[in-house]
Regions:
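Ordered, amphipathic secondary-structure segments that act as subunit-interaction surfaces
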Residues: 61-113
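Conserved small/polar residues in nucleotide/adenosyl-binding loops
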Residues: 139-141
Length: 141
């Protein structure tokens, strides 16, 4: 059975690319002495997978990483130990057993909140409503 981490990627960490982030997690598990499952084959490596990779330069408070916990490390100890081994800007919030397949998370509905330092612009609401009312065309390629 797979396990999941809920983590945030903010500050300077938002400039870490997806592949570098995967390697960062693999190394952090080793530094934190948390045993995880490895891939099978001629060159086994720690198995980690990020549900929906972010583009470089974007930050997030709710990223999901899938891995396989081995040994007797309790779920409640993983966030603290792993955060201590991560670079600045990456914080592990929660570790838990996976309930659904990772591919199912790609079809989740998201709610986005935008904060404006000078209040919400008056023209924003009608513009957003017009955008949401547009019909979406599909192109076959």
């Amino acid at each position: 059975m797979a396990d999941r981490l809920l983590f945030s990627k903010t500050g300077r960490a938002k400039y870490i690319s997806h592949l570098d982030l995967m390697r960062t997690f693999q190394r952090a598990f080793a530094r934190a002495q948390i045993r995880i499952k490895h891939t099978e084959g001629f060159n086994p490596h720690p198995f980690v997978s990020i549900a929906l990779p972010l583009s470089v330069g974007y930050s997030s408070q709710c990223e999901i990483l899938e891995f396989g916990l081995m040994g007797d490390t309790p779920y409640d100890q993983v966030p603290q130990r792993l955060t201590a081994a991560m670079p600045e800007g990456i914080v592990i919030h929660q570790c838990y057993p996976a309930q659904r397949k990772l591919k199912e998370l790609a079809s989740i509905n998201y709610i986005m909140n935008f904060e404006y330092s000078e209040g919400r612009p008056q023209e924003a609401e009608p513009a957003m409503q017009a955008l949401l009312n547009q019909e979406i065309g599909r192109a076959h390629v």
